Amino acid sequence: MTTPALAWKLLLLCCLLMPLAARTAPAPRELLDSGHADEALRLLNGASGSRNAESSNYLCRVYYSLQDWDNAIRHCERAVKSEPGNAVYQLWMGRSYGQKASVSNPVWAYALARKTVACFKVAHELDRNYMPAARDLAEYYTTAPAIVGGGNDKALALAAEIAPQHPSDAAWVRAMAAASAGHPEEAEREYAEAIRLDHDSATTYLDLAHYLRGRKSWDRFQQTVERAMQSPRIQPADRYNAAEMLLRTERNLDQAARLLLAYIHSENTGEEAPVFRAHFLLGEVLRKMGDNGQAAAEYRAALALASNYRPATDALRRLGQR
């Protein structure tokens, strides 16, 4: 075979293989959704474009899932500096500031809280139909003190704004405001309205369950979780969230374990419920049930996906294992 002919055959082979490589190479979002934090970091840090806004935002979100707030902030600030008009980037920067504020001393927490609400407001102003930003802003308004920009009046104004296009979300905001103001009957009416408007979705039932948990209304809490899990409009992440609530209340741990296993083995996991953290939560459930051996196996499964996830490392250490 002549050299030119060989060269053409090699070129043709490369052209045929390139689409296959493109299909098999995981994208950052796919790795986030499947909970492969270590692999996502390797991909993003090794990419030639790792300093562009999109990659910086993904790095922020990976570190956020790992509860590494300092690195999350660093990369989110880089993304926002490159593209300040991106609502998604502003939202994730606000979330990172908020989480850092929750573990900071009062002076730093005050400054970070101000940054948090500023980012949420910018994100909402950039895209008023982007409900994750609107909901985070509403939650901030109903939970933060006025000195750092909170206020039920602001939450209710936001609810009125989004109500025409997003009535269920608006009812949820009104429920949060009523709960914050100490009006439990009104809060429950609005939670019920959110459930009705969202056609009995599991997510809205879990919003009500979260409220009932805070009021220590345990029987109704358990009933509401059950209704959420029986909803025809249930998403895989709803099972994760229900299991976490059951774990935190130390109620019905058998069900919590089943829900986490169902989520881990589903084909539709997501960034909002990291798979490595589902393994960690399952380990916590099993430990509380007295099965330290299986708990350790779940902690290790979490670390296999996210080797820097400190809660799993600490949990193994408490069990006297590595």
Predicted feature locations:
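Alpha-helical adaptor scaffolds
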Residues: 29, 139, 143, 210-214, ...
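Residue-level recognition of tetratricopeptide repeat
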Residues: 29, 52-54, 61, 86, 95, 102, 130, 167-169, ...
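Structural marker of alpha-solenoid helical repeat scaffolds
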Residues: 49-50, 82, 126, 162-165, ...
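Canonical tetratricopeptide repeat
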Residues: 58-61, 92, 136, 173, ...
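Short coil/linker segments at helix-helix boundaries
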Residues: 31, 67-81, 85, 89-129, ...
